[in-house]
């Protein structure tokens, strides 16, 4: 029996509310509707069903009388049912399944099924497998479809519902996402088009799914559309024609039997594919292969820059581990070509592993890492600093800084090193040449990390050797007695030498001209920077910090969190020059400027 599609023909105007009716809806939901004179059950439940993606054509309503369900027509007046309970259930022949969404973090490479963009945090349906971003939830089909199930079983249910006598047409060539995605309602009719109704689940699947309590409400009202029973008949046309002929095979031949009867019954042989189907299957297989290969691609691939895209303009300088050039790559950049001749496979892999760590560094006092190159040699691309190095300011240009500025440079350097150590990155070559003053007095630390380049290799095994400049080397690094002498404390020693440069304006051991003598005496503990050369206006707290950073035993040196806290406390304790609180006298009258005693004396004069 086809239920009516509209309100009763009496055309009576609804009047005031007289009561309520409790309604139990599908998917274990319930609501309360207001009873109004002149309205039918159809009208009263219309909104409650539409917001849940249902309509009266696919549901049946019961009255609950003494615990028993009694079928009630949709055109029944709602007024006599005041205070009663109604039950709305989905028709048994309507294969409706609700989504079961869960929040998921995709650690393997995944893409949204709708916007086709990278997906990390999102949602996934446990039944049909849809995965999507939260902002793509409006594109999710209203009805859940388990695409992994057998379509043949569903086709039988659709054909039974439509009478089984209709000749089905060829499947549509539209994409599956277009068929499964709800569209806006058509202006010509209040019922949706076939595109609004996705493929339902098979007949043996459960009709209702209980929504998880932890599932967010990603379906808004605008994402749902009412369903028409006629849509189920039209939906069967979008399935493959091999399922259409299986119903005609009534001879009882098994599905997998290769007998001629199975072929003559209208169902194609598994091996007889049309050229169009073969091309479509091949393209789908190629797409899956591309996605699979993309999923196993190393994330460092997106940070490796092709050499043809980088233009080297001018050589800036040469250091211990490479040559720095000014280049162009989407703007001005600094390119450091490292001194690695004929790198082995082990060196190349170690270099790429280190780039994975450096690409995650983001700090105001750290040079921005932008990419790397492995052909023809190892190279690192960083941001371009317009300013000069701290070494150039102190020892070449003789820039004069006041004590407040020097302490601020020391604080920013400690802040940047504290960030690197928090990332478990040891600089290994901290010195004034690698500290840049960018746009005024903003400190930028460069040339950090690079353990692969700063290590001597013997075949596939790295051999530890002293790396860096001699003046900034700690004693344990010079001796090389430990398997790995580089530590956070060795960076602290180098930072202590930088503090010495700031507070004295000169390099340590300037009176010794022999490099080997410096290496021997510092490694033995016979030589240390002369603290008597420190400026007389240097605060005592800075003197003590400088002395602690240059300790011979590395266990006695402080770490950068303690160093940073000490300098910040020192900065707060420095005297501040405050602006004068005096007011200008531009708008005062001459009488206001005179003292009151003079004015009173003037009045007493006869």
Curated annotation (Swiss-Prot):
Residues modified as Phosphoserine: 157, 162, 186, 214, 257, 269
All copies of domain RBD, residue ranges: 19-91
Zinc finger (Phorbol-ester/DAG-type): 98-144
Cofactor binding: number and manner: Binds 2 Zn(2+) ions per subunit.
Top EC class for this record: transferase
Binding site for Zn(2+) 2: 112, 115, 133, 136
Residues that hold Zn(2+) 1 according to the record: 99, 125, 128, 144
Subunit and interaction comment: Interacts with TH1L/NELFD.
Role summary: Involved in the transduction of mitogenic signals from the cell membrane to the nucleus. May also regulate the TOR signaling cascade. Phosphorylates PFKFB2.
Name the record gives this protein: Serine/threonine-protein kinase A-Raf
């Amino acid at each position: 029996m086809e239920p009516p599609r509209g309100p009763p023909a009496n055309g009576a105007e609804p009047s005031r509310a007289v009561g309520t009716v409790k309604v139990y809806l599908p998917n274990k939901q319930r609501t309360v509707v207001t009873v109004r004179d002149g309205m039918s059950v159809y009208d009263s439940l219309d909104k409650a069903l539409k917001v849940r993606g249902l309509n009266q054509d696919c549901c049946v309503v019961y009255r609950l009388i003494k615990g028993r369900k009694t079928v009630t027509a949709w055109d029944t007046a709602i007024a006599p049912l005041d205070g009663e309970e109604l039950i709305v259930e989905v028709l048994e022949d309507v294969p409706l399944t609700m989504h079961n969404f869960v929040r998921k973090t995709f650690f393997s490479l995944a893409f949204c099924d709708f916007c086709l963009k990278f997906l990390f945090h999102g949602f996934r349906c446990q039944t049909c497998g849809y995965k999507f971003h939260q902002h793509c939830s409006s594109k999710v089909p209203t009805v859940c479809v388990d695409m992994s199930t057998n379509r043949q079983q569903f086709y039988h249910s659709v054909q039974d519902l439509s009478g089984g006598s209709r000749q089905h047409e060829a499947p549509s060539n539209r994409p599956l996402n277009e068929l499964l995605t709800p569209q806006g309602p058509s202006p010509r009719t209040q019922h949706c088009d076939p595109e609004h109704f996705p493929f339902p689940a098979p007949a043996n699947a459960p009709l209702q799914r209980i929504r998880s309590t932890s599932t967010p409400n990603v379906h808004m009202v605008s994402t749902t559309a009412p369903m028409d029973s006629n849509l189920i008949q039209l939906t069967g046309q979008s399935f493959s024609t091999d399922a259409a002929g299986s119903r005609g095979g009534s001879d009882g031949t098994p599905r997998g039997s290769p007998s001629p009867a199975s072929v003559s019954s209208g169902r194609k042989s598994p091996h007889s594919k049309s050229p169009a189907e073969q091309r479509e299957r091949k393209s789908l297989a190629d797409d899956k292969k591309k996605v699979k290969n993309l999923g196993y691609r190393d994330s460092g691939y997106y940070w490796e820059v092709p050499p043809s895209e980088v233009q080297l303009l001018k050589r800036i300088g040469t250091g211990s581990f490479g040559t720095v050039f000014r280049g162009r790559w989407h703007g001005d950049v600094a390119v450091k070509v490292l001194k690695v001749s004929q790198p082995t496979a082990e060196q190349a892999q170690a270099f790429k592993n280190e780039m994975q760590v450096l690409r995650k560094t983001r700090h105001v006092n750290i040079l921005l890492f932008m990419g790397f190159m492995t052909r023809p040699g190892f190279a690192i691309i960083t941001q371009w600093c317009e300013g000069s190095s701290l070494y150039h300011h102190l020892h070449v240009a003789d820039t004069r800084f006041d004590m407040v500025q020097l302490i601020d440079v020391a604080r920013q350097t400690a802040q940047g090193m504290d960030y690197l150590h928090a990332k478990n990155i040891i600089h290994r070559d901290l010195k004034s040449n690698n500290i840049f003053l960018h746009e005024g007095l903003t400190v930028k630390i460069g040339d950090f990390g690079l353990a692969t380049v700063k290590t001597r290799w013997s075949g596939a095994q790295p051999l530890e050797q002293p790396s860096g400049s001699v003046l900034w080397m700690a004693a344990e690094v010079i001796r090389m007695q430990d398997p790995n002498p580089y530590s956070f404390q060795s960076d602290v020693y180098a930072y202590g030498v930088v503090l010495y440069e700031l507070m004295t304006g000169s390099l340590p051991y300037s009176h010794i001209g022999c490099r080997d003598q410096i290496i021997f005496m510092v490694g033995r503990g016979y030589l240390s920077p002369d603290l008597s050369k420190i400026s007389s206006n240097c605060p005592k707290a800075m003197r003590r910090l400088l002395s602690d950073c240059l300790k011979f035993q590395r266990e006695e040196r402080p770490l950068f969190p303690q160093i940073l806290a000490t300098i910040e406390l020192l900065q707060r304790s420095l005297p501040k020059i405050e602006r004068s609180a005096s007011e200008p006298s531009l708008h005062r009258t001459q009488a206001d400027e005179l003292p009151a005693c003079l004015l009173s004396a003037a009045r007493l004069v006869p």
